[in-house]
Swiss-Prot record:
<dbReference type="InterPro" id="IPR000362">
    <property type="entry name" value="Fumarate_lyase_fam"/>
</dbReference>
<comment type="pathway">
    <text>Amino-acid biosynthesis; L-arginine biosynthesis; L-arginine from L-ornithine and carbamoyl phosphate: step 3/3.</text>
</comment>
<dbReference type="InterPro" id="IPR022761">
    <property type="entry name" value="Fumarate_lyase_N"/>
</dbReference>
<comment type="similarity">
    <text>Belongs to the lyase 1 family. Argininosuccinate lyase subfamily.</text>
</comment>
<dbReference type="Pfam" id="PF14698">
    <property type="entry name" value="ASL_C2"/>
</dbReference>
<protein>
    <recommendedName>
        <fullName>Argininosuccinate lyase</fullName>
        <ecNumber>4.3.2.1</ecNumber>
    </recommendedName>
</protein>
<dbReference type="InterPro" id="IPR008948">
    <property type="entry name" value="L-Aspartase-like"/>
</dbReference>
<keyword id="KW-0055">Arginine biosynthesis</keyword>
<dbReference type="InterPro" id="IPR020557">
    <property type="entry name" value="Fumarate_lyase_CS"/>
</dbReference>
<dbReference type="GO" id="GO:0006526">
    <property type="term" value="P:L-arginine biosynthetic process"/>
</dbReference>
<keyword id="KW-0963">Cytoplasm</keyword>
<dbReference type="InterPro" id="IPR029419">
    <property type="entry name" value="Arg_succ_lyase_C"/>
</dbReference>
<keyword id="KW-0028">Amino-acid biosynthesis</keyword>
<keyword id="KW-0456">Lyase</keyword>
<dbReference type="GO" id="GO:0004056">
    <property type="term" value="F:argininosuccinate lyase activity"/>
</dbReference>
<dbReference type="InterPro" id="IPR024083">
    <property type="entry name" value="Fumarase/histidase_N"/>
</dbReference>
<dbReference type="GO" id="GO:0042450">
    <property type="term" value="P:arginine biosynthetic process via ornithine"/>
</dbReference>
Length: 458
């Protein structure tokens, strides 16, 4: 039976019912709806709507229902109830009879669903934070194991300067740390309870909403009933967090797809996260990474869709807001799955050090070192830049790296170049000189690993 049937003399068209019903997706809020109902029953005792004995009966029945839901959540989908609130109330009435009809006193589905969704978001944020830190930890461990793996760093997808695989790993640790911070900030803002705001104007019962918020584990109660039932900022924030986080994971995936390619050959992925071809027996495809990259788009779409849904809504609640859940559920599920999968990809990855080092020695990645050498000899940087550019052209013409050019050839471009230039052009020197904080020098990378381990309690 619908919760609102008294006003109507005709039954809803079955096509409208299917269009209107939300149980097929909001069943995921069942546990939160039951927990919220237990807290509401306690609040009704404080204003004399329920006796202590009635509340006890309701709480016992709701707790039984909670265990039934946890044991078999799919049972909910066998119902033709309109939404999860209708389903919970119907099941409660089945268990306690007419007493169950008293529970909704002073409460609206508007503040009820807003509360349920915030409770769900809080739990999901904690899961995301755990998965995020697990991936950070996996990156730090991979970095620690590959501090000596020298590889080319890229700009414009062209070899630029030598870095290490460890330094690359730590770059993504930084991105994930920002994702973690955003989630923590979002959690602070959504940690306010809308329960007790009614449909839009507040409840007619003098319920202590701060006490009610505390029972539900919220930091406080919201301040304005109109805003409370129509606020979906936390949905937008979480979708934004997910969109940014998935961009980071997509870039991570793209880097490793390239590193794993035959053209680069810097890493080999485990068989556990790759697949083959139905036609070409030799193929070993990085499907896990490609799916992470591909799933980024659906999360961006969820954020854009929700913004467009909310942008023209008048205060307060509108049924448009029912559209908040499917996109949110899918986006956060996707982000969580991708965090877990990225960590799995790192488990068993093999870094091919000789190939990485060979690539780092190609492409004149030490050209900047020669320019810095000239600057140290008193040549203005802009002039040094031009000199080195000419030297690179000559090295390309001869088919040699810079460090293989004879001194006489180098001195054609600048007489200040001496025998002391050759140690400067080594890969190790290139790394050692980047010793400022955040640089790629072995000492800085080791310090960054230690700092990350301390922050993550590894």
């Amino acid at each position: 039976m619908a919760l609102w049937g008294g006003r109507f003399t005709q039954a809803a068209d079955q096509r409208f019912k299917q269009f209107n019903d939300s149980l097929r997706f909001d069943y995921r809020l069942a546990e939160q709806d039951i927990v919220g109902s237990v807290a509401w029953s306690k609040a009704l005792v404080t204003v004399g709507v329920l006796t202590a004995d009635e509340q006890r009966q309701l709480e016992e029945a709701l707790n039984v229902l909670l265990e039934e839901v946890r044991a078999n959540p799919q049972q909910i989908l066998q119902s033709d109830a309109e939404d999860i609130h209708s389903w919970v109330e119907g099941k409660l009435i089945d268990k306690v009879g007419q007493l169950g009809k008293k529970l909704h006193t002073g409460r609206s589905r508007n503040d009820q669903v807003a509360t349920d969704l915030k409770l769900w978001c809080k739990e999901t944020v904690r899961e995301l934070l755990t998965a995020n830190r697990q991936l950070q930890s996996a990156l730090v461990e991979t970095a620690q194991a590959n501090q000596d793996a020298v590889m080319p760093g890229y700009t414009h997808l062209q070899r630029a300067q030598p870095v290490t695989f460890a330094h690359w790993c730590l770059a993504y640790v930084e991105m994930l740390a920002r994702d973690e911070s955003r989630l923590q900030d979002t959690l602070k803002r959504l940690d306010v309870s809308p329960l007790g705001c009614g449909a839009l104007a507040g409840t007619a019962y003098e319920i202590d909403r701060e006490q009610l918020a505390g029972w539900l584990g919220f930091a406080s109660a919201t301040r304005n009933s109109l805003d409370s039932v129509s606020d979906r900022d936390h949905v937008l924030e979480l979708l934004s967090d997910a969109a940014i986080g998935m961009v980071h994971l997509s870039r991570f995936a793209e880097d490793l797809i390239f590193f794993n390619s035959g053209e680069a050959g810097f890493v080999e992925l485990s068989d556990r996260v790759t697949s083959g071809s139905s036609l070409m027996p030799q193929k070993k495809n990085p499907d896990a990474l490609e799916l992470i990259r591909g799933k980024c788009g659906r999360v961006q779409g969820a954020l854009t869709g929700m913004m467009m849904t909310l942008k023209g809504l008048p205060l307060a609640y509108n049924k448009d807001m029912q559209e908040d859940k499917e996109g949110l559920f899918d986006a956060l599920d996707t982000w969580l799955d991708c965090l877990h999968m990225a960590a799995l990809v790192l488990d068993g990855i093999q870094v091919k050090r000789p190939r990485c080092q060979d690539a780092a020695q190609q492409g004149y990645a030490n050209a900047t070192e020669l320019a810095d050498y000239l600057v140290a000899k008193g040549v203005p940087f802009r002039e040094a830049h031009h000199i080195v550019g000419e030297a690179v052209v000559e090295a390309i013409r001869q088919g040699k790296p810079l460090e293989a050019l004879p001194l006489a050839d180098l001195q054609k471009f600048s007489r200040v170049i001496g025998d002391d230039v050759y140690p400067i052009l080594s890969l190790q020197s290139c790394l050692d000189k980047r010793a400022a904080k955040g640089g790629v020098s072995p000492l800085q990378v080791a310090q960054a690993i230690n700092d990350a381990k301390a922050r993550l309690a590894l």
